[in-house]
Curated annotation (Swiss-Prot):
Family from the record: Belongs to the complex I 75 kDa subunit family.
Name of this protein: NADH-quinone oxidoreductase subunit G
Cofactor binding, note field: Binds 1 [2Fe-2S] cluster per subunit. Binds 3 [4Fe-4S] clusters per subunit.
Organism in which the protein naturally occurs: Shigella flexneri
Domain 4Fe-4S Mo/W bis-MGD-type residues, every copy: 221-277
Assembly mode: Composed of 13 different subunits. Subunits NuoCD, E, F, and G constitute the peripheral sector of the complex.
Domain of life: Bacteria
Protein keywords: 2Fe-2S, 4Fe-4S, Iron, Iron-sulfur, Metal-binding, NAD, Quinone, Translocase, Ubiquinone
Residue intervals of the 4Fe-4S His(Cys)3-ligated-type domain: 83-122
Lineage: Bacteria, Pseudomonadati, Pseudomonadota, Gammaproteobacteria, Enterobacterales
Residues the entry annotates as binding [4Fe-4S] cluster 2: 151, 154, 157, 201
Binding residue positions for [4Fe-4S] cluster 1: 99, 103, 106, 112
């Protein structure tokens, strides 16, 4: 700690910080542009000037840039010194000489750091009356709009994109006051994290193009704290709504999880919530048609049918909340509840959970991954299956440069010096996968092989670290040399990290990862292990337990069950579509509860229209076992009284109560959570994921809307001039109104949107943190459900045999895509241009045997259908395998590991 003196007052601060960071952490306002908590200091904008004095007697002082000056013990500075204030105002005036005066038409207006800093410096009159320099804007793809004339040359965009996210296609061109930030030519930004430019840029150069189509100001949107639903990582988000539509998603700061950044799937993949073809009312089949029902009719009709059924089973979903899955389990009984996950995937999920809970190895939070100094990724294409983890791995690898700089006593915020000292030095990263990955550019070595051989590599590494681990026979000398290099790197690391998961389709890969972690722990290393699952609540469903999807289908096929309730699950993704359709056709009653229109609705007798994450509350559990609550953003029935979209748990509990002819006793979310805790002790921690509905601050609920929210009384005037009462939220501590507490200093960690007096942009998160870039002042939201066990597991001993290609037979290797493999986000219209067209990848040798080239269409039979796809040649794919894009149209993820036998060139 250090003692500094600011305008005559004494403060205790972190001596490792610079003065700007220290003052912001104290709640003092210093304007800045080029500095960012995640990017460090370069002193490019000169906006954060303060007056520094030699001692208490010095009255003259000198101007210094606070972002480039350490907060040393005994420092005396003044923020309010007149010369410093005039200098800061003049800097803004320089920047404004070329900045257009277009705030009324700029999409950044009301969410703009430049506006905030201009007001803060007091600059309110423009003296420059001459020609401004202008630029041509670029088309940067479907996600981001580009308006270069608004640029103030703060360099944040390229520092984030190139230095932090390792992007290669955005740069700066030109000189002096005529610089251009963009691509060498028009084209879609290639980085999976390009959307963060929207929040990194302090002006309106980079804005959210998906928001542009239905634009409104930040102060006119309704927000709620939420959790990204597009993968298992559980990033915190702030969805914004207007007129019953999601308009944009912003990053919600969580110092333990996603920090300041999201991936592009999480930021832009929300379009499925706004689809017009979503089920919005319950419907029941009458012959070949569906008739619309109200909620009471739906409940009575469903209950009447279920009463006549001899056995009802329920099929849950890894994309549904803990509460919804539990409500289904209560409806059908624990013994009749099935997870809706394929048997193989469920085995891998249970093993991953066992490793995390009983393995004796620490599981780091997402932010903690950045602190590891050697990383081994076994089997997961992390950028495609858990992209935010990949960004954290990139920071971990860069830790080598920070380590070298620290040895020379260079402060952690001196990023230019760190990059200069590091000269691209990296901590070791080793990656195994069936083919190339997006992390290969920073990897020390990549191993492209079938999953069996990847597992064998992992087992061999574990044995080399600890000879009591099972040995692997038949390792080639060249591969053994690589294993020795990996072992040396992992053994020499203070904090090695092992990353694996369920998406590779191999239980042995997970076992190998666990063995490597155990061997490293035995050598005294501070080792961590991270498991990546498939869906947002895969871990929660795994903890809850239940039979596999195949077991559920068997119940229907044999006639033991004659009614099935399917919860938020497109079963075609987890089993053969032919088998699913045949099994459902045998059931006299098929009830589907979902917020998306799926293929199995063709077999449904009753469809209950449920609410998406934006219209409901619930709890999900991420890949590290962290329970996190998401909250309802808006009530769709407020805009259309015909809409009947209830939370899935509310539908299912109402049905259960109707079936038993009793009063509904779960009238709010807290009642469901209490029931979960009582029945499933392993999930007891979810009660602490967020405060209950009685939480108040000074007697007030928390506001979902900014206090400047406008137009509320006119929003439904086209329907009726009589304004209805605002929706009443009985489930949570939030209110559907601007009338509630939204103070940044209030004792809360669930924050719907970032705003503080004088701070309207995302930089307002500074006001909610205990120190800038640290944790939220009153704790980061969410709670871990299990901690590292003391004992640990024994070594896994089932080493697989080497992969052997078979003539005339090909094994399907899984290829995942950030844009396209996820069930929900692939429905977003904006994603269509970013999704690759379905393909089949072949090794050059296999392509030669078949007599086909790149672009040739080949066909194969699967599930009673003939599939025809164009060939792509993959040099890294081992012969004897074919690669298919998992989750794309007609290519279910359950295909991973299956075999094809009739692959041939398609008839023209």
């Amino acid at each position: 700690m250090a003692t500094i003196h600011v305008d005559g007052k004494e403060y205790e601060v972190n001596g490792a910080d610079n003065l700007l960071e220290a003052c912001l952490s104290l709640g003092l306002d210093i304007p800045y542009f080029c500095w960012h908590p995640a990017l460090g200091s370069v002193g490019a904008c000169r906006q954060c000037a303060v007056k520094q004095y030699q001692n208490a007697e010095d009255t003259r002082g000198r101007l210094v840039m606070s972002c480039m000056t350490p907060a040393s013990d005994g420092t005396f500075i003044s923020i309010d010194d007149e010369e410093a204030k005039q200098f800061r105002e003049s800097v803004v005036e320089w920047l404004m000489t070329n900045h257009p005066h277009d705030c009324p038409v700029c999409e950044e207006g009301g969410n703009c750091h430049l506006q905030d800093m201009t007001v803060m410096t007091g600059h309110s009159f423009r003296r420059y009356r001459f020609t401004k320099r202008t630029h041509r804007n670029q088309d940067l793809g479907p996600f981001i709009s580009h308006e270069m004339n608004r640029c103030i040359a703060c360099y944040r965009c390229v520092r984030y994109y190139k230095d932090y996210a390792d992007g290669t296609d955005l740069g700066v061109y030109g000189a002096h006051d005529n610089v251009y930030f963009g691509r060498p030519e028009d084209g879609t930004l290639e980085s999976e994290f390009s959307g963060n430019l929207v929040e990194i840029c302090p002006t309106g150069v980079f804005t959210d193009k998906t928001h542009s189509e239905r634009y409104n100001r930040k102060w006119d949107m309704q927000f709620a704290p939420s959790i990204c639903q597009q993968c298992s990582i559980g990033c915190n988000i702030s969805p914004g709504e207007r007129y019953g539509e999601l308009r944009r998603i912003e990053n919600r700061y969580n110092g333990t999880v996603n920090h300041y950044f999201l991936c592009d799937r999480g930021r832009f993949g929300y379009g499925y919530v706004n689809l017009k073809d979503r089920p919005r009312q319950p419907v029941q089949r009458r012959g070949d048609d569906f008739i619309t029902l109200n909620a009471e009719q739906a409940m009575q009709g469903a209950a009447d049918i279920l009463r006549q059924s001899k056995k009802v089973i329920g099929i849950g979903s890894p994309r549904a909340s803990v509460e919804s899955n539990f409500a289904l389990r209560e409806l059908v009984g624990e013994e009749n509840f099935y997870t809706g996950i394929a048997h193989g995937e469920q085995e891998r999920l249970q093993l991953a959970l066992k490793v995390l809970r009983e393995g004796g190895i620490y599981t780091p939070a997402l932010r903690e991954i950045e602190s590891y100094d050697a990383v081994l990724v076994l089997g997961e294409d992390v950028t495609q299956t858990g992209a935010r983890v990949a960004l954290a791995v990139r920071q971990a690898v860069k830790g080598k440069a920070r380590e070298m700089a620290a040895a020379q006593k260079v402060a952690d915020w001196q990023i230019a010096a760190i990059l200069n000292i590091g000269q691209r030095a990296k901590h070791p990263l080793f990656v195994t996968n069936v083919d190339d990955t997006r992390l290969d550019d920073i990897a020390a070595w990549t191993y492209r092989a079938p999953v069996e051989d990847q597992a064998r590599l992992g087992f061999a590494i574990a044995h080399a670290l600890d000879n009591s681990a099972p040995a692997v026979d038949g390792i080639e000398p060249e591969l053994q040399n690589k294993i020795d290099v990996i072992v040396q790197a992992l053994a020499g690391a203070k904090k090695p990290l092992i990353i694996s998961g369920t998406n590779a389709g191999s239980i042995e890969v997970i076992q190998a990862a666990a063995n490597v972690a155990k061997a490293l722990k035995g050598r005294g290393a501070d080792v961590g292990i991270t498991m990546i699952a498939r869906s947002v609540n895969s871990m929660g469903l795994g903890i809850m337990g239940g039979g596999s999807l195949e077991e559920a289908l068997t119940e229907l096929e044999t006639g033991r069950a004659d009614a099935v309730v399917v919860l938020e699950n497109d079963l075609h993704r987890y089993a053969s579509a032919t088998r699913v359709n045949a099994a459902l056709a045998k059931a006299p009653l098929v009830m589907v509860v979902d917020h998306q229109r799926t293929a199995i609705m063709e077999n449904a007798h009753l469809v209950l229209s449920s609410a998406s994450f934006a219209e409901s509350d619930g709890t999900v559990i991420n890949n590290e076992g962290r329970a996190q609550r998401f909250f309802q953003v808006y009530d769709p029935a407020y805009y259309d009284s015909k809409t009947v979209m209830l939370e899935s748990w509310r539908w299912l509990h109402s049905l259960h109560s109707t079936l038993l002819s009793r009063e509904v006793d779960w009238t709010q979310l807290d009642h469901v959570i209490d029931a979960v805790v009582a029945k499933i002790p392993e999930l007891a921690g979810i009660k602490d994921a967020a405060p209950d509905a009685t939480f108040r601050i000074r007697g007030q609920k928390l506001a979902r809307e900014p206090h400047r929210y406008s137009g509320r009384t006119a929003m439904r005037a086209n329907i009726s001039v009589h304004e209805p009462r605002q929706p009443q939220d009985i489930d949570t501590m939030f209110t559907f109104s601007m009338e509630g507490n939204n103070q940044p200093t209030a004792h809360r960690s669930q924050v719907p949107f970032a705003w503080a007096p004088g701070w309207n942009s995302p930089q307002a998160w500074n006001k909610f943190q205990d120190e800038v870039g640290g944790k939220l002042r009153f704790g980061d939201p969410g709670v871990r459900l299990f901690e590292t066990s003391e004992n640990g597991l024994d070594y896994f001993t089932s080493v697989p045999a080497r992969f052997q290609p078979q003539d005339g037979k090909w094994r399907i290797a899984p290829y995942y895509h950030l844009f396209g493999s996820d069930e929900l986000s692939q429905r977003a219209p904006v994603f269509q241009s970013r999704m690759p067209q379905p393909y089949i990848k072949l090794n050059p040798a296999d392509a030669a045997k078949l007599g086909v080239n790149a672009g040739t269409r080949v066909s194969f039979s699967y599930d009673g259908n003939t599939v025809t796809l164009p060939v792509e040649i993959a040099e890294g794919l081992t012969a004897g395998q074919v690669g298919l894009p998992m989750g794309m149209s007609g290519i279910a993820p359950v295909l991973a590991g299956a075999h094809l036998e009739d692959l041939k060139e398609a008839q023209q």
